[in-house]
Swiss-Prot record:
PANTHER family found in the cross-reference section: 40S RIBOSOMAL PROTEIN S11 FAMILY MEMBER, SMALL RIBOSOMAL SUBUNIT PROTEIN US17M
Highest taxon above the source species: Bacteria
Protein keywords: Ribonucleoprotein, Ribosomal protein, RNA-binding, rRNA-binding
Keyword Cell cycle annotated: no
HAMAP family: Ribosomal_uS17_B
Family membership: Belongs to the universal ribosomal protein uS17 family.
Self-association and partners: Part of the 30S ribosomal subunit.
Keyword Chaperone among UniProt keywords: no
InterPro entries named in the record: NA-bd_OB-fold (IPR012340), Ribosomal_uS17 (IPR000266), Ribosomal_uS17_bact/chlr (IPR019984), Ribosomal_uS17_CS (IPR019979)
A Pfam family it matches: Ribosomal_S17
This protein's name: Small ribosomal subunit protein uS17
Source lineage: Bacteria, Pseudomonadati, Pseudomonadota, Alphaproteobacteria, Hyphomicrobiales
């Protein structure tokens, strides 16, 4: 099974070796036929601690690292 790759914005970097990434998705509501935005926070592993709040990053699904972390940071798409 291929690993999922998502792109989002760093919303928290207060934990050691962990960042929180907000990923936003858009879809058309089946009944209202209106575009709806939904977001979800993912805890991602950041070994070096180089990413800061506001950075746009790509994260990749991986094996569980801790209770909440199942994602690792691949690269920075844009700095804040």
């Amino acid at each position: 099974m291929p690993k999922r790759i998502l792109q989002g914005v760093v919303v928290s970097d207060k934990q050691e070796k962990t960042i929180v990434v907000k990923v936003e998705r858009r879809f058309t509501h089946p009944l209202l036929k209106k575009t709806v935005r939904r977001s979800k926070n993912y805890h991602a592993h950041d070994e070096a601690g180089t990413y800061k709040i506001g950075d746009t990053v790509s994260i990749e699904e991986t094996k569980p690292i801790s209770r909440l972390k199942r994602w690792i940071v691949l690269e920075t798409a844009a700095k804040a």
